[in-house]
């Protein structure tokens, strides 16, 4: 049986990933482990739009942040691409967010993003592109969900910037349909035929909430960041590999796992790749 890749991103993104992965020849199915919806109070978003030109930088932490921020653009604003002020930088934490910004009409020259060869895509990698700039007395807006990491804001404040947050969306617990529950049951009972793809630590936590008694020790996962790798390890996944959050990199990783090399055991684990007492194995992919 072909290896089935389970995409756990929010529904709209998961559907797009499944389409792209399927086009590359993978068997992929969506099991969204996070719901995303607009915040009930849109007033702060409208105020942020009205004050946009006062900012030197607006940081978007995810494609969801881009989608919901632009969806809240006031009615008096013209349609993209004319909505984005020419003097304001848009900060992106990775390729998915950059793509969303481009689709929203932000010119490529105004997007600050991690280097393509960055070891990981996050706010730390974004800061490596921003740290050479002067930030004293500059205003920065961070667009995110109702909660998130404050690391970049703290660093910018240490450099003299005035940093504010605006919540563009909220995360909600997953509500899988009958097909989703069937996929969850199959993945739990037939781990050798399934491979999980995690793009957030919250998704891993939601999986535990959906199946608190599940034994994941024989299950495998791909994760797009070391923090997500650790979350999957903590949940008990037997094998976790880190990969870049791109369709191409995920495809390469899934093909490797679906085609075990000579001498691999039934789980696809090669000799010498021991799990050991310190926990499940982590293999860094050279993609």
What are these regions (language model features)?
Residues 1-268, 276-287:
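Conserved beta-alpha
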């Amino acid at each position: 049986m072909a290896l089935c890749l389970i995409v756990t991103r929010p529904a709209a993104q998961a559907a797009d990933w499944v389409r792209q992965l399927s086009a590359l020849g993978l068997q992929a199915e969506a099991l969204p482990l996070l719901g995303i919806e607009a915040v009930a109070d849109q007033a702060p978003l409208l105020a942020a739009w009205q004050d946009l030109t006062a900012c030197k930088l607006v940081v978007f932490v995810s494609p969801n942040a881009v989608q919901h921020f632009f969806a809240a653009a006031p009615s008096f604003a013209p349609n993209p691409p004319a909505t984005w002020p020419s003097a304001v930088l848009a900060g992106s934490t990775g390729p998915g967010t950059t793509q969303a910004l481009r689709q929203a009409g932000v010119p490529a020259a105004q997007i600050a993003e991690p280097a393509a060869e960055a070891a990981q895509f996050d706010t730390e990698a974004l800061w490596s592109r921003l740290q050479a700039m002067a930030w004293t007395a500059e205003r920065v807006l961070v667009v995110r969900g109702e909660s998130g990491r404050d690391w970049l804001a703290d660093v910018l404040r240490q450099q003299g910037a005035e940093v504010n947050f605006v919540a563009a969306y909220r995360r909600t617990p997953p509500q899988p349909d009958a097909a989703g529950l069937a996929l969850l049951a199959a993945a739990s009972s037939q781990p050798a035929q399934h491979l999980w793809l995690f793009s957030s630590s919250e998704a891993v936590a939601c999986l535990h909430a959906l199946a608190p008694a599940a034994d994941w020790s024989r299950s495998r996962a791909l994760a797009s960041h070391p923090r997500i790798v650790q979350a999957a390890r903590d949940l008990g996944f037997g094998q976790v590999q880190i990969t870049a959050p791109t369709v191409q990199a995920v495809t390469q990783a899934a093909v490797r796992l679906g085609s075990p090399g000579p001498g691999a055991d039934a789980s696809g684990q090669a000799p010498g790749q021991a799990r050991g007492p310190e926990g499940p194995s982590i293999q860094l992919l050279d993609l």
